[in-house]
């Protein structure tokens, strides 16, 4: 097994990027080889550790992966769907693995990334949290036992800056439940309700979205019957939980061949 892996972090100056840098410094099996920011940023040349508030790490922020091609083996990417596709293409052409925590991909972008996985080791997950990945397993059980006779609603909340809605985690929750029940999420999902609506169909899965303040991430799946309801909830209080999960994924990916993996495999929750 690999003892230590060298990583690069894209979007190094963002909220998640700085948290990833901090997590890398605290991880004994991770070595930060590079941190990348967009061209023209005033932070180019700044020490990544000092930027993240964890002390100097002797890694200067650079504006191109090409400048750091010899400094890392695995890229950790929490940027935007468009940027993540570009970064995955770069990794595919340069013999690098990649951990993708970006959300908001459309179907075509997901297919592009899957194609790159034919020659590139990729971990792609809408949520790197251990607790969230365990929640998905609990949702499978709840859907098996209660899904056919309850009304299912998914409620999620994030900070005011989050751009995609519903969150990737919420959509994954819906996908997990729909798969167990033999439903097509694209056909049974209901995104918000307004005005006078018809009586709720039990075949649907509802989604509600909250964007407010500095919420890190809260997700609830509700299985509601007459007289009782089951709620399965995960609340994140710090981005560090996602960053630590990304480091765990990067370390695991260091021993894997080409393929498209997810956090369930990283955590040993499925083959």
UniProtKB/Swiss-Prot annotation:
Record CDD domains: DHDPR_N
Record GO cellular component, one term: cytosol
UniProt GO BP: diaminopimelate biosynthetic process; lysine biosynthetic process via diaminopimelate
Keywords, alphabetical: Amino-acid biosynthesis, Cytoplasm, Diaminopimelate biosynthesis, Lysine biosynthesis, NAD, NADP, Oxidoreductase
Record: active site: 158 (proton donor/acceptor), 162 (proton donor)
Pathway field: Amino-acid biosynthesis; L-lysine biosynthesis via DAP pathway; (S)-tetrahydrodipicolinate from L-aspartate: step 4/4
Catalytic activity: (S)-2,3,4,5-tetrahydrodipicolinate + NAD(+) + H2O = (2S,4S)-4-hydroxy-2,3,4,5-tetrahydrodipicolinate + NADH + H(+); (S)-2,3,4,5-tetrahydrodipicolinate + NADP(+) + H2O = (2S,4S)-4-hydroxy-2,3,4,5-tetrahydrodipicolinate + NADPH + H(+)
Major location (coarse): cytoplasm
Binding-site residues for (S)-2,3,4,5-tetrahydrodipicolinate, renumbered to this chain: 159, 168-169
Highest taxon above the source species: Bacteria
Binding-site list for NADP(+): 38
Protein's cellular compartments: Cytoplasm
EC assignment: 1.17.1.8
Binding site for NAD(+): 11-16, 37, 101-103, 125-128
Single GO MF annotation: NADP binding
InterPro entries linked: DapB_C, DapB_N, DapB_N_CS, DHDPR_bac, NAD(P)-bd_dom_sf
PANTHER family, alphabetized: 4-HYDROXY-TETRAHYDRODIPICOLINATE REDUCTASE 1, CHLOROPLASTIC-RELATED (PTHR20836:SF0), DIHYDRODIPICOLINATE REDUCTASE (PTHR20836)
UniProt cross-references to HAMAP family, sorted A to Z: DapB
NCBIfam families: dapB
Family, as annotated: Belongs to the DapB family.
Function comment: Catalyzes the conversion of 4-hydroxy-tetrahydrodipicolinate (HTPA) to tetrahydrodipicolinate.
Record protein name field: 4-hydroxy-tetrahydrodipicolinate reductase
């Amino acid at each position: 097994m690999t003892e230590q892996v060298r990583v690069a972090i894209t979007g190094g100056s963002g909220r998640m990027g700085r948290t990833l840098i901090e997590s890398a410094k605290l991880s004994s099996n991770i070595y930060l080889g590079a941190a990348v920011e967009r061209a023209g940023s005033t932070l180019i040349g700044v020490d990544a550790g000092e930027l993240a508030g964890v002390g100097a790490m002797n890694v200067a922020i650079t504006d191109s992966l090409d400048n750091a091609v010899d400094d890392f083996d695995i890229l950790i990417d929490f940027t935007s769907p468009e940027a993540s596709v570009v970064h995955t293409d770069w990794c595919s052409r340069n013999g690098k693995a990649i951990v993708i925590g970006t959300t908001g991909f459309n179907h075509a972008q997901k297919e592009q990334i899957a194609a790159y996985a034919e020659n590139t080791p990729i971990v792609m997950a809408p949520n790197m949290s251990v607790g969230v990945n365990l929640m998905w397993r609990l949702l499978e059980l709840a859907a098996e036992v209660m899904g056919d006779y309850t009304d299912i609603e998914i409620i999620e909340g994030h900070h005011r800056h989050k751009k995609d809605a519903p969150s990737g985690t919420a959509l994954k929750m819906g996908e997990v439940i729909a798969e167990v029940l033999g439903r097509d999420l694209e056909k049974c999902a209901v995104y918000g309700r307004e005005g006078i609506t018809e009586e709720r169909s039990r075949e649907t899965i509802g989604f509600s979205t909250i964007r407010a303040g500095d919420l890190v991430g809260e997700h609830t799946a509700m299985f509601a019957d007459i007289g009782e309801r089951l709620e399965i909830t995960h609340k994140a209080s710090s981005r560090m939980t996602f960053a630590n999960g990304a480091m765990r994924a990067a370390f695991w990916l260091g021993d894997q061949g080409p393929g498209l993996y997810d956090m369930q495999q990283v955590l040993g929750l499925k083959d």
